[in-house]
Amino acid sequence: MKVQDVQNLNNINVTAPDQAAKLRYGLGAYANPRVQKDLYELTNSQVKKNPVEAVYEKFLAKYNPNALLERYMTEESVNKMLQEAPVVSKILAEKGVKPVVCIENLKGIRNSHVDTTVQVAVALADEMKLSKDDKQTIALGSLFHDFGKIMIPEEMLNKNGKLTPEERSVVDTHSQIGYELLKTTGMSSKALSIVRNHHRSASMTNDVLSKIVSVADVYSALTEERAYKGKMSSEDAMSIINSFVSEGKLDGKVVSALKNCLAKHNELAA
């Protein structure tokens, strides 16, 4: 089944005003196609939203992230992708790793890192005046940016300590692995580029959508708690992010947009 085949899938009707008002940044409640138009009108008339929220909600209704993630976060789905993308097994074999599907890897980051990354990426896209299509692409690409981690051994991904150079080289393959797996689903080439390039240095790519998700990804990772580190404040995170700009790892224009976003949207600050 292709990505477009599961857009808008849901069995939940969200029609009550109090339910509609709760469609704010979360990944829990969405309307099915029959009530989307009414829901848009309802939320737009009864809930005062900033542009970021509006774009994000339209993305939720169009793609239904829960449906997409649930569809692909099964061993059956990933094994089918592996059959259609044998290069993934080759990539892992070159690192001495067996191709084992680790569903739990994605479940742990799905409602924290992924959600925050999507929110920040959409905010950046709005701040940088990107087109509606590009905003939708950024939301989709950032939603799946870490999908390749489904093939990374859990003991490496969640290691309570510094990774060895060998382990780091394995973890770093998740971008290419995610790209190869999702390429079999019919996802758009622009969204796939985000998945593949979100860890690539800004100086090594001209893809502005990937640069945006890179900044959102780094900010999200720094400001959340991980097995190997504590949560960092927005101020401390920005200090590190600024150093990455100096090193050519992150794009300066995107980081400037992030500073503006943090000043405008308190909900994005850690």
Which residues does each predicted region cover?
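Short hydrophobic alpha-helical segments that form membrane-spanning helices or hydrophobic packing faces
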Residues: S256-N260
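Non-Sec secretion/translocation targeting segments of pathogen effectors
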Residues: M1-Y30, R34-V35, L39-S45, A270
